[in-house]
Amino acid sequence: MINIIIKANMKKIILQGYDVGDFSNQQSIVPIYKGNNIEAYLAQKAPEAREIFIYAHGSQYFSHEHSLPQLSLTLQSSNNELVPSILSKITENTEENKPNIVHILSCHASTAHYNMQNINGNIVLCTYAPANYVSNGYVAELLFNTKNNFDNLNDFIVKKLPLLTAISFGISYKLDENVYPLIFDNSSIKGMDINSFSEFLQKQYIKVQKFYTNLQEKYVDKYPELFPEYNFPEKISYSTEELKQAFNVLLNLDSEKLSIEEIQHLLAIDNSHVGNILADAIKCNRTDAIEVVINTMKEATTVDLHSAVKFNNLAVLNRLLDKTEKVENCILQEAIQEHKIEIAEMLINSNKIKSFTNDYLLVAINANNLPILKILLNKEENIVGYLLYRAAELENINTAETVELLFDKTKETDYFINTRVLLRAVKENCLSLINKVIGRMNEFDDIPDVIFDSVIERGNTQIIKILLEKIASFDFLIKAINSNNLPAVEDILKTIKVENKDIAAIIMSGNTDMFKILANKIGDDKILDIAIKLGDSSVVNNILDEKEKQGILDSNKLDEIFETAVKNSNGNVIEDIMNRMPEVTGKHLTIAMQYYAPERAFIFDKVYNSIKQIEYNLILTAIDSGIPDVIQKLVSKLGDEKKASILYDILRSSDIVKNMVVSNILLNNIAKIPDNYKYALLDLTSKGNSYGIKNFFIFNRLLEKSGPIDEEHLNTYLGLLDPSDMFSIMCMGSLYNMKHLASNHNNITTVEDTIVDNLTVTGEINITPSDVNLL
């Protein structure tokens, strides 16, 4: 009995290089390290030995067999590391020099066995490809999954010896600076049959026994965890299926090195998986090998069809289509994406595609494959809107042609799809598609700004005319104006009915060329009116200069223009117009009063300051307007005599509000009431006018501006005061505190007491001497 076993239940991990596919069950078996994580893992300390799978692209540094191999573990191939340096990092970071088990699943992996002396530390290395072989994903995954069914390495080697022999499995132990390799050679089994291969395996089995026996005897004491007891059967046997699998793996491992006779021989033993050999044969254009493989297979798989599509081999694809009942979606999609038109057409016409879905169209659209799209559209009756939207989004050359094909096949399109398609059509000046989209749009649909921008940018007048029949002309005109596109502006103005907002937009652009185009269309009177409203002095003056040259600018026209300017509060324009007038008169000030508002006060001031003489009727007009600021300005130029006369007329009116407001303004501007108006005004306010209106507030203000009052009038006015009226009380204070009364009464307290007594007797109001002083 020989005892050889590798420690079971070691922690398994995988270092996965870039650009290699995942194994189907790797996530559930091992932690995975990729990219920068690999570098971090190789740098960290490990307390226990591990079982490590390195799955990466491998290459030999030199061409000869024993050269140093490389592994591509990172994204950049220039960062490839030599296998010995990677393995040394693993061993050096394992505590107590415990031996790790490392499996290299890559091309040329066996080369590593010839460089074991370059590795620092103890290690068990397993490889699964000869030094001169290129491995493949099928074989790598098969071996990975097979090994993971065994925790015991010896079990794996013994029970899977046919498979390992076929792939030239190699194992090396590096212990205490000594290297012990065992490497199988598959070259002799290519011509064997099942029986001879079975006999050959018995000899290989004896080599395995001897190899481990020697190691166990030498190292069992020092490394007992590597060499516990293991029971080797006296004789080993394998099932026919296991033996066939080995031949099939050999067939797929590197078929380029097999002769046609060897291929035929191996296929005769097992043809269950021929995907790799067929792919290699198509790639190398080995027609004899292709013929042999296809004749042998019962049914073509998706992998086989993929190989024919990948290498664009119509003849092989045609043969394979005869060997399958159904073509999977991915095959046709691949042909479309790769722009393999003949391949795609053959697949479409093969009747092996069960249903044509919009998925194929999407692939053709994304690939901008117009020929294939045309073929596919013949198979589809109705296209979903998303495909049309997607096509319109692409920025490829001649996308509009693709979009138009889809648009014709899409029965229903919404606003968003229509606008996106319209933008694409505009960008490529596709008039036919523009007409189709416009015809399908709702009359109330808005056109996004991006379409306006695109139309104006290209300046295609035909497109402009088409769109003007559908869309709001003003928005379109604004875009043309803002981009200074004269041809577009001219075309739009020819088509639309020009409105004030259009004129305003052109005026505000400041573009004189556009201005001339507009003037030719509507005449300058309309432009002048809008320019005045906008306050554009430059345009106004240009038009007025032209009218002066033509002799058609008279005073009536200027008055009309002046009133328009006043209405629109354009001070600069008003000033320019007044400068053209022979004289600014009351008529112009009346207009300014007519449209007066606090925010327009500056306009009134401009006109007011330009008038040389204020006529009396203007003042009356101002008073009638009831505008305090206007009245204030006009009466300020009058003398006190004239102001008193107007005040008398105002106080005689029946308008209480005007009576109060205008009287106050006048009194604010009168320094002293003329004597000839003093008693007339005081009588009018205290006794009442013909309408019975008294105004003790104004009466009190008149007292302030009237000077001394004789005793007769004083007594009369005191008798007229109403103690219940607040303003009457104010008047009492004014009367009793006038200077001329102080000189006629030696004891003012007696006078105050008299007032208080009189007021108290009335029973209507009580007032104290201190109240009188306060008043």
Curated annotation (Swiss-Prot):
Keywords of the record: ANK repeat, Repeat
Cystine connections: none
Ranges of the ANK repeats in the UniProt entry: 66-95, 300-329, 331-356, 357-385, 447-476, 523-552
SUPFAM superfamilies the record matches: Ankyrin repeat (SSF48403)
Keyword Repeat: yes
Protein name (record): Putative ankyrin repeat protein RBE_0801
Species in which this protein is naturally found: Rickettsia bellii (strain RML369-C)
Top-level taxonomy: Bacteria, Pseudomonadati, Pseudomonadota, Alphaproteobacteria, Rickettsiales
